[in-house]
């Protein structure tokens, strides 16, 4: 009986789910980077005030609220730069500062703010009614520009610097926005990793064999071992020569085969029993058969000229009685 065991095949994961997970993992870092770059809208503030001096000079202050690096600052009056305005000063972080009259002094206050002093003649100066604009070029936000003018009701020396509340509020908004985006990204990544880790194992396909197949597979090794053990007893007697025994028997086949019980040939014996069973010699078989004939009262056929009669272990009297003396 031949039985074939089918190995259950593993069901491959769904391609759509795996592809979607891969695309999400690749798109997420780019989304986080874009949100971090664009978090917090950049802003430019401009302040114009009149100093209480003999010449009544004007001071222009500009600042940039953003996370990018500033590469160039341009200050103009009469309108935005390139739209009818006149350039007063150009400030570069590495190449230095260039200014034109009536600008008297331009300098960097911080890395994101500058100041410019203009010479004037008080309230009648044309600078009092004009508009000043500051343009910041930054990376990666780009160019941002804002304009401002002197308030009409401002008195010399009473113009106060801008309150830091809007500046601080813009900085906090940018910091909190970036932090929130990073925190959300980390939580989302952990969620994806945990979901991928706890994904259920692939399901096994049910075997198509009959219910008796496992039982047949279980009995197959035992039947093979029993077939190996069912070996005739005569196969281990390699020292016996059937031709010699047939020659010694004048009446046909050897009688010692018939004397053995028939069920011994089908009795399974283990390897240890075979190894411990001694292989009988030719003389021992003849002795056993002679003893059997002696018990039956007949002359043993193995007492020819080529064979030697071994004495019976019961003594000479037992041999002389049935056989007689010739």
Swiss-Prot record:
Describe its partners and assembly state: Interacts with NECTIN2, hence competing with CD226.
Q: Which organism is it from?
A: Homo sapiens
Additional information: Was named PVRIG for the homology observed between its second exon and the variable immunoglobulin domain of the polio virus receptor (PVR/CD155) and polio virus receptor-like (PVRL) genes.
* Protein name (Swiss-Prot/TrEMBL): Transmembrane protein PVRIG
User: What mutagenesis or variant effect is reported for residue 233 to F?
Assistant: Reduced phosphorylation
Q: Where in the cell is it found?
A: Cell membrane
A GO molecular function term, named singly, is: phosphatase binding
Q: How does it sit in the membrane?
A: Multi-pass membrane protein
Q: Which cysteines are joined by disulfide bonds?
A: none
Phosphotyrosine sites (modified residues)? 233
Q: Which residues cross the membrane?
A: 26-46, 62-78, 172-192
Gene Ontology cellular component list? plasma membrane
An example of a Gene Ontology BP annotation on this entry? negative regulation of T cell receptor signaling pathway
Report the protein's function: Cell surface receptor for NECTIN2. May act as a coinhibitory receptor that suppresses T-cell receptor-mediated signals. Following interaction with NECTIN2, inhibits T-cell proliferation. Competes with CD226 for NECTIN2-binding.
The protein's gene is named PVRIG
């Amino acid at each position: 009986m031949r039985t074939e065991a089918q190995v259950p095949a593993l069901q491959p994961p769904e391609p759509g789910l795996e592809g979607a997970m891969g695309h999400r993992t690749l798109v997420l870092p780019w989304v986080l980077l874009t949100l971090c770059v664009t978090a917090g809208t950049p802003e430019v503030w401009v302040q114009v005030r009149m100093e209480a001096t003999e010449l009544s000079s004007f001071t222009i202050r500009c600042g940039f609220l953003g996370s990018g690096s500033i590469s160039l600052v341009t200050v103009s009056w009469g309108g935005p730069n390139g739209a009818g305005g006149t350039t007063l000063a150009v400030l570069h972080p590495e190449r230095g500062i260039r200014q034109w009259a009536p600008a008297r002094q331009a300098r960097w206050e911080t890395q994101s703010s500058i100041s410019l002093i203009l010479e004037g003649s008080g309230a009648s100066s044309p600078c009092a009614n004009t508009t000043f604009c500051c343009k910041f070029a930054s990376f990666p936000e780009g160019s941002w520009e804002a304009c401002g003018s002197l308030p009409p009701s401002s008195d010399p020396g009473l113009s106060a610097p801008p309150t830091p509340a809007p500046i601080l509020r813009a900085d906090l908004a940018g910091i909190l926005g970036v932090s929130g985006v990073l925190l959300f990204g980390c939580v989302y990544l952990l969620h994806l990793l945990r979901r991928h880790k706890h994904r259920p194992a692939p399901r096994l396909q049910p075997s198509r064999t009959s219910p008796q197949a496992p039982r047949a597979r279980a009995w197959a090794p035992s039947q093979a071992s029993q077939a190996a053990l069912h070996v005739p007893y005569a196969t281990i007697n390699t020292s016996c020569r059937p031709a010699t025994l047939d020659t010694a028997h004048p009446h046909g086949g050897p009688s010692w085969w018939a004397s053995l019980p028939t069920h011994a040939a089908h009795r399974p014996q283990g390897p240890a029993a075979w190894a411990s069973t001694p292989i009988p010699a030719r003389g021992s078989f003849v002795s056993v058969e002679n003893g059997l004939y002696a018990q039956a009262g007949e002359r043993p056929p193995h007492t020819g000229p080529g064979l030697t009669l071994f004495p019976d272990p019961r003594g000479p009297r037992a041999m002389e009685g049935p056989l007689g003396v010739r």
